[in-house]
Amino acid sequence: MMHPSGAVLKDAVERCQGFSANLREPLRRLEVARGRVVLVIGCGDPLLMASCEPVRPWRRYSSFLVGADHAPLLTEHRGTRLCIDVGLAPWAAGEILGEGVREIGRQPVPLEAFLGRKAERLAESLAQVCTWQARFSLVERFLVQSRKQTRQPARGEIRWAWEMIERTGGRIAVTALSRRLGWSHRHFVACFRAHTGICPKAAARHMRLVRAARMLAREPDMDLGMVASRCEFADQSHFTREFHRLAGCAPGAYRRFLEIGATSPLTRP
């Protein structure tokens, strides 16, 4: 279930979704980085996750954070689980969760390791409310309160640069952004990374991947060469290499995974 962000968080929250499942058989998915920090608050049976590149063993997570540049992840779930998934612009994640969120790296981080007892109390509160509206309101209050307490606003120039990268689907040159700000390239890259935890070139790569992944999902019959062209990759070979580097599989394998739905294109690590 999708939830529209309130006015206070509209600039920060790019997506807020609720999920509820009771599964007898395991469901496996491939999760690729989409250039945003993802906060997941969950209760019930934990989620199994394993990094694909580099290969890591399966670990159990209930509530967790993943960074904007996380490694391709396999997730597997069986049983009863309820969670809310919040996608945050990386600059906003720093405003809400503190600058430490910019250093979480490419692997998932258990939320309790980042927020301590606050994470456990949040999950317990989520388990006690019975409607989606109440659950979304609970999470929204947490985000608003955390933002007020952190008091680490991102620079307006970085927020603007992030919006431009996102609006163009990663197709704007980093040098064009620094020129429009009147900054040196080196200063812009350093400042962008300090506020988001990711360099602007990596952000653009992920935005372009998101655009390509959406096109693969929405246009199942479109030729891969056409997808590469529309997303402004140099050619299909470049598209395949870049997609594999960021998603852990080739675009054709990803498309087949979407068609199957419940089976990952990757083997279990």
Regions from the PLM with identified roles:
Residues 1-185, 195-199, 214-218, 223-234, ...:
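Alpha-helical bundle regulatory/interaction domains
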Residues 182, 203-206, 237:
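Conserved structured core elements
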Residues 192, 204, 242-244, 255:
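DNA major-groove recognition helix of helix-turn-helix
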